[in-house]
Amino acid sequence: LEENQDQIKIITSNEQICSKYLICCAGLMADRVAKLLDIKINFQIIPFRGEYYRLKKHHNSLVKHLIYPIPDPNLPFLGVHLTRMIDGSITVGPNAVLGFKREGYKKFNFSIKDTLGFLSFRGFHNVLKKNFRSGVYEMKNSLFKRGYLKEVQKYSPQIKLNDLKPYPAGIRAQAVLEDGTLVHDFLFAESRRSIHVCNAPSPAATSAIPIGKYITEKATKAYNNLT
């Protein structure tokens, strides 16, 4: 990315695109992309893997709605919950496990660059101090399926270990401030010709349309101020 007085250039290995203004939703790479435009930021994106299971089909009639635990108000994670999908199947999850690769969707994916990146970040050390016990607990439940099951059985005790079947994981792009704060709200970074969505917690998907409208309004105002 290159920004000058007249435009922004998006340079890829195949082409170069010029634009008057850029709206960037880079997810797991949001902080790195913002830095490409020399935007000063006080946070880093740290990946948290959300692991799910799917229940066996005979449990499809178990719930008709979402069932959530009471979340920890100090953490931006909603906890393991039951979700009835569009096709009628039931998923369980997600947990929130520290990921060692930004785009590592498998349990043991690892990136030296990504891991060294957060290990050298002061904010991560502060997160660890504040949330060490809960972090170890999440890691244990990730490695040992019975621990995960106990979380589910708190509000659905009839579910057994062999009812939990594999299901794809997701990665949460969690913005962490230098003081160790896990950002609970939406976070934006801006340059003269760009706006970057750097943190989009729940209910980002549910509220996608009004959030999109909000971003568009901010971008339109910034663009109009250029002329």
Residue ranges of model-derived segments:
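C-terminal catalytic lobe of FAD-dependent flavoproteins
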Residues: 107-109, 113, 117-226
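Flavin-dependent oxidoreductases
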Residues: 1-110
